Amino acid sequence: RSLWWPRGKVLGGSSSINAMCYIRGHAKDYDEWEQLGAEGWNWKNVLPYFRKSEGNVRGTSALHGGDGPLTVSDPRYLNPLTPVFVEAATQAGFDANDDFNGERQAGFGLYQTTTRDGKRCSSAVAYLNPVRKRKNLKVITKATASRIIFENGKAGALVYAVDGKGGFCEAAAKEIILCGGSINSPQLLMLSGIGPAAHLRQHGIDVLVDAPGVGGNLQDHLDVCTMHKCTQDITYDNINQALAGLRFVLFKQGPGTSNVAESGGFWRSPLAEDERPDVQFHFVPAQLDDHGRNKVPGSGFTLHACFLRPKSRGRLYLTSNNIQHKPRIEAGYLSDADGFDMKVMLEAAKQSRRIIAQPAFDAYRGPEMFPGDTAQSDA
């Protein structure tokens, strides 16, 4: 089965195409990174950088920055179903949480978003736009890095193509920062001769460093979705786009300012291995099939639940020695030997159903479209 893996080939990277929910990792995540060998990456050390980068509209606090370049905002508009979901979560016994990046992560509430004046605040908007006129900054668009040239064991230059035409090369005065993301960074390293030796030779690439870990240990958060029809035509499925656009242009208000996934929560399942929540929920007042790429008629809502720390691992493989040829992504979803990931996902799906079954949804809950009424066992 093939799944869609979108990436942000645009200024700002995937921060220009994501759902804009502003979520840091749990404090223990960073402490664990350091325990695994990433010296200096503990929570105490990274928090000042989170605060420095953040421009939260709520202002400065012990855990938040108020004047950083990345604007973090509260919702300007909520779909009528969003507060219904939050109320239903409370009725189901979950704690309310008005700040998922505060003292505790667990609980349900509204997401803050990386938005400014009702518009997306990507990393390009936050960091690049303010310095575009610097004389020592050159931004090349429509460019694809194809290989890093190493000199005496150090990255010395970058080979790239523009508009598909190769032959360009830039030498590094000081350093090359590799920031192609979880897919393109390992692909570029392998094309440059750093990766599993046998795999590189298979594609005619000279091996500089035999590094089996490059392309490996791939982890992703798989969603399990519960989708219902809505008995009232109030979701984002049939929104008047022209009217929403006009309202946004004139007043910077209305549905055009929404990130759609306006609410959600974090839950510590019975299978959690420590104090951290291990499941995250996103409530979407729309019918999302295949990332919203398939239009579903009528009105509905979707509750997404994902396991935050899967044990399953995947790997990235080259398909050729050409950067233009997309790599093969073997995600390895639900492939862990003891089936632990599947067990957590089943618990998450049950909680999704329990939340939607609460009285708050009685006036809105239509038939369950997915997984459907016939799905009544763990099998």
Model-flagged regions — what are they?
Residues 1-52, 208-213, 221-230:
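N-terminal glycine-rich phosphate/pyrophosphate-binding loop and immediately adjacent elements
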Residues 34-156, 161, 173, 225-244, ...:
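Conserved redox-cofactor binding core of oxidoreductases
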Residues 47, 53-101, 109-111, 231, ...:
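FAD-dependent oxidoreductase catalytic-site/capping-region signature
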Residues 97, 138-140, 206-210, 282:
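General small-molecule cofactor/ligand-binding pocket signal
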Residues 148-151, 155-248, 254-255, 321:
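Glycine-rich loop(s) and the adjacent beta-strand/alpha-helix scaffold that form part
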